[in-house]
């Protein structure tokens, strides 16, 4: 019986990155022997145990054989005669198939260390194509390690393309797709995840509303990058620079879905694409069972991002109405979230990456002015029932109007 450190802990240590969780594989042991040593069994589908002191996971060496469709269609074989090399062979990427023994020596039968040096994400064996979830995992690793220069090996990308074409991805559950996507959205370069899915054809299967944006032109004057799919990824990249929050990043991804509905004879203009895209956002979120708070923000950003771009010329009544529409009084964080996504939209364009976005500052300022109007004072002034809300709205509009007169004087008529 011998234990080896495997997977992410070995990989990240070799990359000089912080090691979070340690996973171990045990060769030459039975479940009874593990239990006798005080390990606690937690795995249902295959034997996984928690160490009695460290509570780190120890899995018995195993092989997997395809026995059905999708990522759950596997039969596992765990027994003392399964070798370390056999266990490593079932893993997805060579960089995840490196083991280390207690003396510090590496066992690397699939040359994962060479691929780490070459910054390559390469599949271990042709059995890679038996698990469709691996397409998303590899795209996520590409996003996670993009800042280190990693790229997907051409032969692995080709295999991912075959998997997308043969219908295997359709067996993935909504929960698994969202879990991988949510994890990818937390990386430093989440746009790479969606770019890789687009390149291998998986985006068309899993996110057709986003995939449809590629090849849709926008006016070159406002969008030198022209392609709306490219703009979407640039906006997501900018949102990731401005905020670590998944809801903000997902909203950036979905902000222009409505442009995919524009009839080609109207290109490159997309009048009304924001409100038109709201139902597409809802469609994506329903299909993938996206959490409600993330869904709701994405719908609001789709509907109102273009309005924010015109903030300096908005009427005070429109500004207060915007705060009503986004339910800012109960969910004040939405003001900041929408400010960030609107800024990401403007700066997510070729040549505009460093552009100042005063609209975000004005939005924040106007919000502070409007929220400073006291509901308590309205009640104390004798207003009751629906009249409270009416008077509160009037006072907020007056306050915003006074602020706006000072901050954004308009010589011409407002729009």
UniProtKB/Swiss-Prot annotation:
<keyword id="KW-0808">Transferase</keyword>
<feature type="binding site">
    <location>
        <position position="21"/>
    </location>
    <ligand>
        <name>Mg(2+)</name>
    </ligand>
</feature>
<keyword id="KW-0694">RNA-binding</keyword>
<dbReference type="Pfam" id="PF12627">
    <property type="entry name" value="PolyA_pol_RNAbd"/>
</dbReference>
<protein>
    <recommendedName>
        <fullName>Multifunctional CCA protein</fullName>
        <ecNumber>2.7.7.72</ecNumber>
        <ecNumber>3.1.3.-</ecNumber>
        <ecNumber>3.1.4.-</ecNumber>
    </recommendedName>
</protein>
<dbReference type="GO" id="GO:0000049">
    <property type="term" value="F:tRNA binding"/>
</dbReference>
<dbReference type="InterPro" id="IPR032828">
    <property type="entry name" value="PolyA_RNA-bd"/>
</dbReference>
<comment type="function">
    <text>Catalyzes the addition and repair of the essential 3'-terminal CCA sequence in tRNAs without using a nucleic acid template. Adds these three nucleotides in the order of C, C, and A to the tRNA nucleotide-73, using CTP and ATP as substrates and producing inorganic pyrophosphate. tRNA 3'-terminal CCA addition is required both for tRNA processing and repair. Also involved in tRNA surveillance by mediating tandem CCA addition to generate a CCACCA at the 3' terminus of unstable tRNAs. While stable tRNAs receive only 3'-terminal CCA, unstable tRNAs are marked with CCACCA and rapidly degraded.</text>
</comment>
<dbReference type="InterPro" id="IPR043519">
    <property type="entry name" value="NT_sf"/>
</dbReference>
<keyword id="KW-0819">tRNA processing</keyword>
<keyword id="KW-0692">RNA repair</keyword>
<comment type="subunit">
    <text>Monomer. Can also form homodimers and oligomers.</text>
</comment>
<feature type="binding site">
    <location>
        <position position="8"/>
    </location>
    <ligand>
        <name>ATP</name>
    </ligand>
</feature>
<feature type="binding site">
    <location>
        <position position="91"/>
    </location>
    <ligand>
        <name>CTP</name>
    </ligand>
</feature>
<keyword id="KW-0479">Metal-binding</keyword>
<keyword id="KW-0533">Nickel</keyword>
<dbReference type="Pfam" id="PF01966">
    <property type="entry name" value="HD"/>
</dbReference>
<dbReference type="GO" id="GO:0000287">
    <property type="term" value="F:magnesium ion binding"/>
</dbReference>
<dbReference type="GO" id="GO:0042245">
    <property type="term" value="P:RNA repair"/>
</dbReference>
<feature type="domain" description="HD">
    <location>
        <begin position="228"/>
        <end position="329"/>
    </location>
</feature>
<feature type="binding site">
    <location>
        <position position="140"/>
    </location>
    <ligand>
        <name>ATP</name>
    </ligand>
</feature>
<feature type="binding site">
    <location>
        <position position="137"/>
    </location>
    <ligand>
        <name>ATP</name>
    </ligand>
</feature>
<keyword id="KW-0067">ATP-binding</keyword>
<feature type="binding site">
    <location>
        <position position="23"/>
    </location>
    <ligand>
        <name>Mg(2+)</name>
    </ligand>
</feature>
<dbReference type="GO" id="GO:0005524">
    <property type="term" value="F:ATP binding"/>
</dbReference>
<comment type="similarity">
    <text>Belongs to the tRNA nucleotidyltransferase/poly(A) polymerase family. Bacterial CCA-adding enzyme type 1 subfamily.</text>
</comment>
<keyword id="KW-0511">Multifunctional enzyme</keyword>
<dbReference type="InterPro" id="IPR012006">
    <property type="entry name" value="CCA_bact"/>
</dbReference>
<keyword id="KW-0548">Nucleotidyltransferase</keyword>
<dbReference type="GO" id="GO:0001680">
    <property type="term" value="P:tRNA 3'-terminal CCA addition"/>
</dbReference>
<feature type="binding site">
    <location>
        <position position="137"/>
    </location>
    <ligand>
        <name>CTP</name>
    </ligand>
</feature>
<feature type="binding site">
    <location>
        <position position="140"/>
    </location>
    <ligand>
        <name>CTP</name>
    </ligand>
</feature>
<dbReference type="InterPro" id="IPR003607">
    <property type="entry name" value="HD/PDEase_dom"/>
</dbReference>
<dbReference type="GO" id="GO:0004810">
    <property type="term" value="F:CCA tRNA nucleotidyltransferase activity"/>
</dbReference>
<keyword id="KW-0378">Hydrolase</keyword>
<keyword id="KW-0547">Nucleotide-binding</keyword>
<dbReference type="GO" id="GO:0016791">
    <property type="term" value="F:phosphatase activity"/>
</dbReference>
<dbReference type="InterPro" id="IPR006674">
    <property type="entry name" value="HD_domain"/>
</dbReference>
<dbReference type="GO" id="GO:0004112">
    <property type="term" value="F:cyclic-nucleotide phosphodiesterase activity"/>
</dbReference>
<feature type="binding site">
    <location>
        <position position="8"/>
    </location>
    <ligand>
        <name>CTP</name>
    </ligand>
</feature>
<feature type="binding site">
    <location>
        <position position="91"/>
    </location>
    <ligand>
        <name>ATP</name>
    </ligand>
</feature>
<keyword id="KW-0460">Magnesium</keyword>
């Amino acid at each position: 019986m011998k234990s080896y450190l495997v997977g992410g802990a070995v990989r990240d240590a070799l990359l000089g990155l912080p090691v979070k969780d340690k996973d171990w594989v045990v060769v030459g042991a039975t479940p009874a022997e593990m239990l006798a040593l005080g390990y606690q069994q937690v795995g249902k589908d295959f034997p996984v145990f928690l160490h009695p002191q460290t509570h780190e996971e120890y899995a018995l060496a195993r092989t997997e054989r395809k026995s059905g469709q999708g990522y759950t269609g596997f039969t596992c074989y765990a027994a003392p005669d399964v070798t370390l090399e056999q266990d490593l062979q079932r893993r997805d990427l060579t960089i995840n198939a490196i083991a280390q023994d207690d003396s510090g020596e590496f066992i690397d039968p699939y040359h994962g260390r060479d691929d780490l040096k070459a910054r390559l994400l390469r599949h271990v064996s042709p059995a890679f194509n038996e698990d469709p979830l691996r397409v998303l995992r590899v795209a996520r690793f590409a996003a996670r390690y993009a800042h280190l220069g990693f790229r997907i090996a051409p032969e692995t990308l080709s295999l991912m393309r075959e998997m997308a074409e043969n219908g295997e991805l359709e067996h993935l559950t909504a929960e698994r797709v969202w879990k991988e996507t949510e994890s990818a959205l937390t990386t430093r370069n989440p746009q790479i995840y969606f770019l890789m899915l687009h390149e291998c054809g998986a985006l068309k299967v899993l996110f057709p509303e986003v995939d449809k944006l590629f090849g849709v032109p926008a006016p070159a004057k406002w969008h030198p990058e022209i392609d709306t799919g490219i703009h979407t990824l640039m906006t997501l990249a900018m949102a990731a620079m401005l905020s670590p929050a998944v809801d903000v990043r997902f909203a950036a991804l979905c902000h222009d879905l409505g442009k995919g509905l524009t009839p080609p004879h109207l290109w490159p203009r997309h009048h009304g694409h924001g409100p038109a895209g709201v139902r597409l956002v809802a469609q994506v979120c329903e299909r993938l069972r996206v959490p409600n708070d993330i869904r709701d923000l994405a719908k609001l950003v789709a509907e109102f991002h273009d309005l924010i771009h015109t903030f300096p010329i908005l009427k005070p009544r429109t500004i207060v109405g915007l705060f009503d529409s986004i339910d800012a009084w109960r969910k004040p964080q939405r003001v900041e979230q929408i400010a960030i996504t609107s800024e990401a939209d403007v700066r997510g364009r070729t040549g505009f990456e460093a552009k100042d976005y005063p609209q975000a500052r004005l939005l924040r300022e106007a919000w502070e002015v409007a929220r400073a109007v006291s509901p308590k004072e309205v009640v104390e002034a004798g207003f009751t029932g629906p009249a409270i809300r009416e008077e509160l709205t009037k006072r907020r509009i007056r306050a915003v109007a006074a602020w706006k007169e000072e901050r954004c004087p308009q010589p011409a008529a407002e729009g």
